[in-house]
From Swiss-Prot:
Record's protein name: MADS-box transcription factor 2
Tissue distribution of the protein: Highly expressed in anthers and carpels. Expressed in pollen, tapetum and stigma.
One Pfam assignment: SRF-TF
Provenance organism: Oryza sativa subsp. japonica
DNA-binding found in the keyword field: yes
Lineage of source species: Eukaryota, Viridiplantae, Streptophyta, Embryophyta, Tracheophyta
Gene assigned in the entry: MADS2
Amino acid sequence: MGRGKIEIKRIENSTNRQVTFSKRRSGILKKAREISVLCDAEVGVVIFSSAGKLYDYCSPKTSLSRILEKYQTNSGKILWDEKHKSLSAEIDRIKKENDNMQIELRHLKGEDLNSLQPKELIMIEEALDNGIVNVNDKLMDHWERHVRTDKMLEDENKLLAFKLHQQDIALSGSMRDLELGYHPDRDFAAQMPITFRVQPSHPNLQENN
């Protein structure tokens, strides 16, 4: 007798359900890789667990977005709403703007000029002239700041040299006074009034007994 059909239904036990999900998920992703390699097929698989965790696989030579675009083109089903269309249009606009900027940059470098009209060449020339003026202005500002900085350093060096010179003069004066036997206490005694000077000890100056 043949095996009877087993009814496919939700597994109630959460532990058994998780184990089965893990095994079946691994099997599906393995089969997706095999058919992609063996048959050179474009395969994209997206799996969400009951907890919302994402598992996916995509053929190495493509991407899920490209596969979805091909699916939308071939099936005629619309996968993207207006919001996504608007976002896609904005991305295309930015890409186009970037391409135009790259072309303009090549023109400013003197590349790919043969296809340009005289009017376009004149506009490039004006842009280059304006750029030269701006560069010269920046260089002048830098030079002026450099001059001011040098002047400040020069003034500071002069002030420092003056202070060092003054200190040398003061030090030289002190050394000269020491060499000549100058003693500040003697000068102080000489400047005192006579009445306050200490008289030398002399027998004639002592009181008679």
